[in-house]
From Swiss-Prot:
Cofactor: [3Fe-4S] cluster; Zn(2+)
Keyword Repressor included in the entry's annotation: no
Reactions catalysed: RNA(n) + a ribonucleoside 5'-triphosphate = RNA(n+1) + diphosphate
Organism field: Sulfolobus acidocaldarius (strain ATCC 33909 / DSM 639 / JCM 8929 / NBRC 15157 / NCIMB 11770)
InterPro entries linked: DNA-dir_RNA_pol_30-40kDasu_CS, DNA-dir_RNA_pol_insert, DNA-dir_RNA_pol_RpoA/D/Rpb3, RBP11-like, RNAP_Rpo3/Rpb3/RPAC1, RNApol_insert_sf, Rpo3/RPB3_RNA_Pol_subunit
Protein name: DNA-directed RNA polymerase subunit Rpo3
Cofactor note: Binds 1 [3Fe-4S] cluster. May bind 1 Zn(2+) cofactor that does not appear in the structures.
TM stretches of this protein: none
Assembly description: Part of the 13-subunit RNA polymerase.
Residues at which [3Fe-4S] cluster binds: 183, 203, 206-207, 209
Length: 264
């Protein structure tokens, strides 16, 4: 059951999985969205806010700022222990603070203005705009972050893209220049006045080329061969997301096994 790497580019990871059931590959995809914990703002306490945004809108924006979470997975308690925590919450929360006032000119507040107690948990990017303050306007707040799962809220999902595609097989049977023009993914090219396949893996099986070049091009998917693509928001490296998603599946299978054995 080979797994091959076809792209590792910063926040993006693409793998080819061969001879795996679609259900298994799709389970990894879903787990990467729903069951890999990352840090995000859970609660916001406003001390002062006379900005153009209501407290609720500003809190929502802060919650969607992704935070680096690699170290958090090692040093903070899991979501199961902290989601409903009211007392004895040590190891659950990190705090960030925002205390900014515009003077005589409008001032844009960015994610880099958030000051974190834990220097290992900071915004993925400091250039995320939060709110534009007018002259003499001020925001002062404290926000609490905890680990959470994407199944709770999308702010806790570590991925912006997690998809499974069928592995394409593209065959040129004739010469049809129109295929180069109509293919949205640039799969084809003309070389020496002949139609050739330039980038087979980019094919999304839309069959747009077949509308104009039926008989000249063959498009099909390879059985039990899939492309898994994961794109991180930056909280975790895509490799870590894949590992944690696989661990979550193993835990769920182990839990299912235990319950089945207990019911015998």
């Amino acid at each position: 059951m080979p797994i091959s790497l076809i792209e590792r580019n910063g926040l993006r990871l693409r793998l080819v999985l061969e001879n795996y059931p679609l259900e298994f590959v799709n389970s990894i995809r879903r787990a990467s969205i729903l069951y890999v914990p990352v840090m995000a703002v859970d609660e916001v306490y406003f001390i002062e806010n006379n900005s153009p945004l209501y407290d609720e809108i500003l809190a929502h924006r802060l919650a969607l700022v992704p935070f680096v979470s690699d170290e958090a997975l090692e040093h903070y308690r899991p979501p199961e222990e902290c989601a409903e925590c009211k007392e004895n919450c040590d190891g659950c929360y990190n705090r960030v603070y925002l205390d900014v006032e515009a003077k005589d000119q409008p001032l844009m507040i960015y994610s880099r203005d958030l000051k974190s107690e834990d220097q290992m948990i900071t915004p993925v990017s400091g250039a995320i705009p939060i709110v534009l303050l007018g002259s003499k306007q001020k925001i002062s707040l404290e926000a609490r972050l905890r680990l959470g799962y994407g199944k709770e809220h999308i702010k806790y999902s570590p991925v912006s893209v997690s998809i499974v595609r069928y592995y394409p097989k593209v065959t040129v049977l004739g010469n049809c220049e129109k295929a180069v023009e109509v293919c949205p993914e640039g799969v084809f090219a003309m070389e020496n006045n002949k139609l050739v396949v330039k980038n087979e893996l980019s094919c999304i099986l839309c069959e747009e080329c077949l509308k104009y070049c039926a008989g000249s091009v063959s498009i099909e998917s390879v059985e039990n061969k899939f492309i898994l693509e994961i794109e991180s928001v930056g909280s975790l490296k895509p490799e870590r997301i894949l590992i944690e998603a696989s661990k979550s599946l193993l835990r769920k299978l182990s839990e299912l096994k235990s319950k089945l054995e207990a019911g015998k």
